[in-house]
Amino acid sequence: MLVTYRYKLRLRSGQYARMAQLCEMQRQLYNAALEERIGAWSRARHSVTRLDQQKSLTEIRQADPEGHGSLPVNMGRWTLKRVEDAMTGFFSRVKRGQKAGFPRFKGRHRWSSFGMLEVSGMQLRGQFLILKGMDRAIRLNMHRPLPADAKIKGATFTLHGRHWFVSLQVESTEIVAAEAPTGPAIGLDVGVEHLATWSDGAVDGHIPNVRPRSRREHELRCAQRALARCRRGSRRRAKVRERLARLHRAIGNARDTHLHQQAERLARSHKLIVIERLQVRNMVRSAAGTVAEPGTNVRAKSGLNRSILDASMAKFLQYLRYKAERAGSAVLEVRAAGTSQLCSGCGTKVPKSLSVRRHSCACGLELQRDVNAARVILLRGLPAEGVQPLGQPNVADHGVRAAGTLLAA
């Protein structure tokens, strides 16, 4: 299994300048490679491939032994792969009819990382990382050890504010748990009031939404207003921008810590977790409309969009998937349509707006809205694990089977 371990670098005073120099060299290489592709196509309608540019990189390294020639060749190849990925993504978006977004040249403030596709030219010895091109070994803040059988497949160095971090791509068999969890299967409904609500049909629970951005909204607004008043290029603007960046990092760290902890707890406690197949990008679309057809309730929808993004539902489900794989449990996705409108007791559709927080059905079932949705999600996922039990309420929208026949999920 491939997993990424992220560590903070404890650099010496002279190593900060060298890391910045390496990052700048890779930025210039990226811009040169992109310019070569654009120029070759505009002049002769010739497509330059990644292999062509890797051959050119060999010539550059031979002509510049003190610069690119002193660095691991995989570092330059990592940068060329980023150019290839940018062009591939552009053509893919064009074919799908989406907004193309042609790759653009990277300025100093739009490039903050470099990496290596392979580990040749880099060694990890205890808490020290030996990197070709650095005069001294780099000390890592190893807050957690790597698995004993870990094989490093790649590395990415990233600058966040004033600090450098390294992300090591590791392959290991010790990461996956030997025994799967034995807890009951649950359905999981994510939302804004609670980050997630789960239910196994008998026991229910909530995961709180900590709302890290909302808690520091006043600080963010003050910093953004101060930045808007600064003159571009001034020292004061640089200081305010750094203050704003630190604030955003603190918010992101608080959010990620909460998401990691809650996803880990669920993955280690339940053998099956059934979730909705959400399209968060569609959920946070603007309601402003156009000049000809202006939208309605624009301010309310904008506030809801901020709350959805602050909760980071998609990131939480992403963490849950890979943590479940490590814990030996399973995550199953089901359709999200109608989960909050159907009754988990009888399968009847009970329409309700977002302001209605209680589910009340004519069959006599009364539940908190999110708990009912979690139970519907669970019932939709159980047939995929086997067959639909006879007499089970048809909340999963499957075809109704006759007695004595089997219905595949």
What are these regions (language model features)?
Residues 3-6, 13-17, 28, 147-151, ...:
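Positively charged, helix-rich recognition surfaces that bind polyanionic ligands
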Residues 41-53, 95, 178-181, 229-236:
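Short, glycine- and charge-enriched coil/turn segments that flank and shape catalytic ligand pockets
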Residues 34-41, 87-98, 172, 277, ...:
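Long, hydrophobic, amphipathic alpha-helical segments used as structural scaffolds
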Residues 51-158, 289, 306, 310:
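Acidic carboxylate diad motif detector
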Residues 33, 79-90, 371-380:
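Stable alpha-helical structural segments in soluble proteins, enriched in small hydrophobic residues
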Residues 1-76:
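Gly/serine-rich nucleotide phosphate-binding loop at the start of the catalytic core
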Residues 26-29, 86, 90, 323:
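Conserved short hydrophobic interaction patches
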